[in-house]
From Swiss-Prot:
GO terms for biological process: 'de novo' pyrimidine nucleobase biosynthetic process; 'de novo' UMP biosynthetic process. This is Orotidine 5'-phosphate decarboxylase. Its EC number is 4.1.1.23. The lineage of its organism: Bacteria, Pseudomonadati, Pseudomonadota, Alphaproteobacteria, Rhodospirillales. Belongs to the OMP decarboxylase family. Type 1 subfamily. It catalyses: orotidine 5'-phosphate + H(+) = UMP + CO2.
Length: 235
């Protein structure tokens, strides 16, 4: 079984990110780097981590007009991303533009395109928080609506919380990639995640990729923490 765990390395320090990645290579499936890291270190910082030979999840959550997102996506492909994110709420045209740009640029470079996955509702939002930003329907209904939009528009999958995995899997079928942040082992603190499950629970419900950050990166021994999660998953 392929290790589904991608470690969220949330830092501005390239040296720390590289050191963590080198330490965790044998215990995880890949590394996720986001805006915090990218704005501090740029493409060179991303390439320093991807150069270690592990799959890279470039989590920039692109959300703009279709032409702008398409142009940005070409740059993401050049970073060697295996997975990358856009916002589903950008709409069908934006999603299609992102997917087309990823495929076109990858073909030019002779590499596999990244899986373009669409963020639905941020896992830091509970129902009250979702209502504050204008979601009039329950979070689950909003996630399902955006998942259908993303799938119909060509996205490879979505990002949603573990609590929506089962419903989205039933709605979108077995081949739609479900990338799940908000994963917290039972022995770790919840932090700022409002909608979370343990790694084993999320996998049992149909999650494909488990994004785990501080339970690993903030542990006294990150490799030991990652190995503990790996064992819990039966890997």
């Amino acid at each position: 079984m392929i290790n589904p765990v991608y470690v969220a390395i949330d830092t501005t320090e390239a040296a720390r990110a590289i050191a963590l990645a080198e330490r965790l290579k044998g215990q995880v499936g890949g590394f996720k780097l986001g805006l915090e890291y990218f704005t501090a270190n740029g493409p060179a910082g991303m390439e320093a981590v991807s150069g270690l030979g592990m799959p890279l999840f470039v989590d920039l959550k692109l959300h703009d007009i279709p032409n702008t997102v398409a142009a940005a996506m070409k740059g993401v492909v050049r970073l060697g991303a295996a997975i990358t994110t856009i916002h589903a709420s950008g709409g069908a045209a934006m999603i299609r533009a992102a997917v087309d740009a990823a495929n076109d640029e990858a073909a030019k470079l002779g590499i596999a395109p990244p899986a373009v996955v669409a963020v639905t509702v941020l896992t830091s939002l509970d129902q009250a928080g979702a209502e504050q930003v204008g979601f009039e329907r329950p979070v689950l209904d909003q996630v399902k609506r955006l998942a259908t939009l993303a799938q119909d528009s060509g996205a490879a999958g979505i990002v949603c919380s573990p609590l929506e995995v089962e419903a989205v899997r039933a709605l979108c079928g077995p081949d739609f990639k479900l990338v799940i942040p908000g994963i917290r082992p039972a022995w770790s603190e919840a932090g700022d995640q409002k909608r979370f499950l343990t790694p084993a629970e999320a996998r049992a419900k149909g999650a494909d990729v488990l994004v785990i950050g501080r339970p690993i990166t903030a542990a006294a021994d990150p490799a030991e923490a990652a190995g503990r999660i790996k064992a819990e998953l039966g890997l």
